[in-house]
Curated annotation (Swiss-Prot):
Belongs to the peptidase M14 family. Disulfide bonds join C248-C271. Carboxypeptidase that catalyzes the release of a C-terminal amino acid, but has little or no action with -Asp, -Glu, -Arg, -Lys or -Pro. Catalyzes the conversion of leukotriene C4 to leukotriene F4 via the hydrolysis of an amide bond. Keywords: Carboxypeptidase, Disulfide bond, Hydrolase, Metal-binding, Metalloprotease, Protease, Secreted, Signal, Zinc, Zymogen. Pfam families: Peptidase_M14, Propep_M14. It comes from Bos taurus (Bovine). This is Carboxypeptidase A1. Changing E338A: In allelic variant. Residues 1-16 form the signal peptide. Residues 121-414 form the Peptidase M14 domain. The lineage of its organism: Eukaryota, Metazoa, Chordata, Craniata, Vertebrata.
Amino acid sequence: MQGLLILSVLLGAALGKEDFVGHQVLRITAADEAEVQTVKELEDLEHLQLDFWRGPGQPGSPIDVRVPFPSLQAVKVFLEAHGIRYRIMIEDVQSLLDEEQEQMFASQSRARSTNTFNYATYHTLDEIYDFMDLLVAEHPQLVSKLQIGRSYEGRPIYVLKFSTGGSNRPAIWIDLGIHSREWITQATGVWFAKKFTEDYGQDPSFTAILDSMDIFLEIVTNPDGFAFTHSQNRLWRKTRSVTSSSLCVGVDANRNWDAGFGKAGASSSPCSETYHGKYANSEVEVKSIVDFVKDHGNFKAFLSIHSYSQLLLYPYGYTTQSIPDKTELNQVAKSAVEALKSLYGTSYKYGSIITTIYQASGGSIDWSYNQGIKYSFTFELRDTGRYGFLLPASQIIPTAQETWLGVLTIMEHTLNNLY
C-alpha cells in the first residue's frame, strides 16, 4: 500500500498537479459581529491566497479557511493580535489528498455493468459519463440521457431523465457538483441514479412518485471544473471560463443566477472564489439549466446538492425577506432532516440560507423559487469540517443513503401537494 501511495504522489507530480504541502485548514470562531467583520477584512487580502471553505456568517458559526503554507504565520499572527480564536482542523491538506489518490488508484477498474460499478470510490468525469451510458442501456424504458448544452471548454452537459411515460408531466430537478471540488455530491448523484432504477417497482413510495412525475438528474453540473479537479487542482470550485479583463479564471456558478445577482454575498473580483461573473447567466453551465427549466415549464421541485456543513436550506439567500411559503418549507425541511438522521444519526440544521449560514446572492434555488418552483432546497452534505471537501470515500455510500431519505421525503411531499 505504501508503494501505491508513493506511485500516486509521483504520478501527481509528473502530471503537474497543484501541490498543497503544508497548507492547513483553520477553524475560526468569531465571537461577535465585530470579529466577523475583522475576518472579512482577512478575506479581502488577496495576496494571502486564502480559500474560505466556510465563509464568515453569523457570530459563533464556524469559519473554515485553507491557508497556504507561506501565509500561515501571517494569518495566525493576525488572528491572535485581534483575539480571535482558531484551531487547526486539517494539519496538512496534501496528506489527505495523497490518501484520496491512493484509494482511487487501488479501486480502479472498468465496470461492465452498473451492478459491478464501484459506488464506494470517487470517479473521473469519463467514468461517470460511461456509467450513465451503462444505466441507460440497462433501463431504456425508464432512463434516457439528454444533452442540455456544452460547457465553456466544449464538454457535453448531460441530464438523466427518469420517466415512466407521458408528456410534460410534473417534474423534479436535482443537480449536483455545481462546485466542482465537492466530490461527495457527484458520487452521491451516481448512487442516486442507480437507486432510482432499483427502487422503481419495488419501493411503493418511490414507484408512486415516478408513476406520476419525471425526475431530471444532473450528476455533473460543472464538467470543466470537475475535470480540472482531477487533472490539475483538486480544490478548484468555479467554472473554467476566461474573463478578458483578468488573468484569473472561472466564475462561481452558484452566484451567477438571476436572483439578487451582484448584491452582497458575492464578489465582483474575478480572482475571488465567489466571483459572480460579468452578468447573470453568463456561464453556459447555468444558462443551460435556466433554458431547460423554463422550456419545460412544469417543474415542481428543484434540489441543488452541495457539500459540506450538514444543512438543508431554502430561500432566500440574497435578502432577509421571508418567502411566502416559509412555514410549509420549514416543516418539509424539518421532516427531511429527521428522516435523514434516522439512518446513521447524522444531524442537520435547517432554515433559510441567509439566516442559517450567510448572505449569498445569485444562487440557484433563489432563482428557481422566483420562477414559481415552490419546493426549492439546497442540501449541504457531510461533514461538518473534519475533512471538509476531502471526505473519505468510505463515507460515500452512507452519505448517499441518508441523503436519499431526505430527498425522498421532499419528493413525497411534492407529489402529495402538487400545485
